[in-house]
Amino acid sequence: MAGLAISPPLGLSFSSRTRNPKPTSFLSHNQRNPIRRIVSALQSPYGDSLKAGLSSNVSGSPIKIDNKAPRFGVIEAKKGNPPVMPSVMTPGGPLDLSSVLFRNRIIFIGQPINAQVAQRVISQLVTLASIDDKSDILMYLNCPGGSTYSVLAIYDCMSWIKPKVGTVAFGVAASQGALLLAGGEKGMRYAMPNTRVMIHQPQTGCGGHVEDVRRQVNEAIEARQKIDRMYAAFTGQPLEKVQQYTERDRFLSASEALEFGLIDGLLETEY
């Protein structure tokens, strides 16, 4: 059994066991293999920051600023480490963490998704697509769920824009957060090894007149059927198996999510 190392454009590399290894690109690799495992952490996406004139290092090296392009500098963190909040004032103003993430085409969702969160994420997706419709976007998820309508709005935007949107989960991707994780570009959906994924049928509350309650129940049933069909398309699993999994809260480890087809690979950490 030979080991195949792949270095994708997003800075991920993983190994796959196959009898006839063939080099392949990350973006064109859409077939899932439950044996795949990421063997290196996400590399820094800030490769062009030196060209912009602003660079930093998490070890505490002094920051260098080029006054010729002060407003477009980005942070260059040590490879394998996440962006670090810079304590620096630049000629273009204070540089905050959200700006660093946005300039490097990274979207972070770390809370339940409601209408306000969906508006922010959709605005970021559309803006990044209008700036550059050829470069990929990376979405980090530590999300316990949220509004079905809001999550479907984000997914529709992810599917509509031209850039490919990869997803990476850590912590928890539950309920509609799991739907977003699975709805990322096929071949670009990942999770940390300690991530917990939970899928289930949509939850709703009903109230009002009897006729109003009946209509709300019908809407919830329709939402469940739609989401089950989406999971079946995302995972390649039969619809009957998806319905069995979503009948009640189904908790999955990262490895089980990989086997089920919700993700395409695992990011490897020390433990």
Curated annotation (Swiss-Prot):
<feature type="active site">
    <location>
        <position position="200"/>
    </location>
</feature>
<protein>
    <recommendedName>
        <fullName>ATP-dependent Clp protease proteolytic subunit 6, chloroplastic</fullName>
        <ecNumber>3.4.21.92</ecNumber>
    </recommendedName>
</protein>
<keyword id="KW-0809">Transit peptide</keyword>
<feature type="region of interest" description="Disordered">
    <location>
        <begin position="1"/>
        <end position="30"/>
    </location>
</feature>
<comment type="function">
    <text>Cleaves peptides in various proteins in a process that requires ATP hydrolysis. Has a chymotrypsin-like activity. Plays a major role in the degradation of misfolded proteins. Essential protein required for chloroplast development and integrity.</text>
</comment>
<dbReference type="InterPro" id="IPR001907">
    <property type="entry name" value="ClpP"/>
</dbReference>
<feature type="active site" description="Nucleophile">
    <location>
        <position position="175"/>
    </location>
</feature>
<comment type="subunit">
    <text>Component of the chloroplastic Clp protease core complex which consist of at least 16 proteins: CLPP4 (3 copies), CLPP5 (3 copies), CLPR4 (2 copies), ClpP1 (1 copy), CLPP6 (1 copy), CLPR2 (1 copy), CLPT1 (1 copy), CLPT2 (1 copy) and 3 copies of CLPP3 and/or CLPR1 and/or CLPR3. The core complex is organized in two heptameric rings, one containing CLPP3,4,5,6 in a 1:2:3:1 ratio and the other CLPP1 and CLPR1,2,3,4 in a 3:1:1:1:1 ratio.</text>
</comment>
<keyword id="KW-0150">Chloroplast</keyword>
<dbReference type="InterPro" id="IPR029045">
    <property type="entry name" value="ClpP/crotonase-like_dom_sf"/>
</dbReference>
<keyword id="KW-0934">Plastid</keyword>
<comment type="similarity">
    <text>Belongs to the peptidase S14 family.</text>
</comment>
<dbReference type="GO" id="GO:0004252">
    <property type="term" value="F:serine-type endopeptidase activity"/>
</dbReference>
<dbReference type="GO" id="GO:0009570">
    <property type="term" value="C:chloroplast stroma"/>
</dbReference>
<dbReference type="Pfam" id="PF00574">
    <property type="entry name" value="CLP_protease"/>
</dbReference>
<feature type="transit peptide" description="Chloroplast">
    <location>
        <begin position="1"/>
        <end position="77"/>
    </location>
</feature>
<keyword id="KW-0645">Protease</keyword>
<keyword id="KW-0378">Hydrolase</keyword>
<dbReference type="InterPro" id="IPR023562">
    <property type="entry name" value="ClpP/TepA"/>
</dbReference>
<keyword id="KW-0720">Serine protease</keyword>
<dbReference type="InterPro" id="IPR033135">
    <property type="entry name" value="ClpP_His_AS"/>
</dbReference>
<dbReference type="GO" id="GO:0006508">
    <property type="term" value="P:proteolysis"/>
</dbReference>
<feature type="compositionally biased region" description="Polar residues">
    <location>
        <begin position="13"/>
        <end position="30"/>
    </location>
</feature>
<dbReference type="GO" id="GO:0004176">
    <property type="term" value="F:ATP-dependent peptidase activity"/>
</dbReference>
